[in-house]
Amino acid sequence: SGLAKQLGISRHEAQEYVNRYFKRYTGVEAYMNNIRDRARKLGFVETIFGRRLYLPEINNRNAHRRQYAERSAINAPMQGTAADIIKIAMISMHNWLSSNNIPAKIIMQVHDELVLEVAATSIDIVHEKIDHLMSSAATLDVPLIVDVGVGKNWDEAH
């Protein structure tokens, strides 16, 4: 298996790791099975915001194609929702910066990060607003934790 190869252990040991993980985090296996079954029935999965990923190979007889679609079915709702949330935060941030004539601009998005260029005089207000806008980009059962870094370059900000 991929886990065995990645960890440099036998397939049997890797399967034991997986079994222990599922035993400790009981909801994970149920979630995965539920998502897989739903994807097989509907042919797609959705993010929390309703964006769909269609999975035409989810019922394929070819095991490799089917398993790839199953992995996508399991990963896409979470990864897609994270992508949706960062886009919502980015739009909110852009709108706030524009409507308030803040001397700052969004430079890029990297996974779940936004990188901004901000005038030194506006760092404090932008810092505070980023925290608020990003943490309130979606209402979830868990909090969205935001870490804001400041520096003269991306490396320093980390």
For the regions a language model picked out, list residue spans one by one.
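Conserved catalytic core of nucleotide polymerization and phosphodiester-bond processing enzymes
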Residues: 1-158
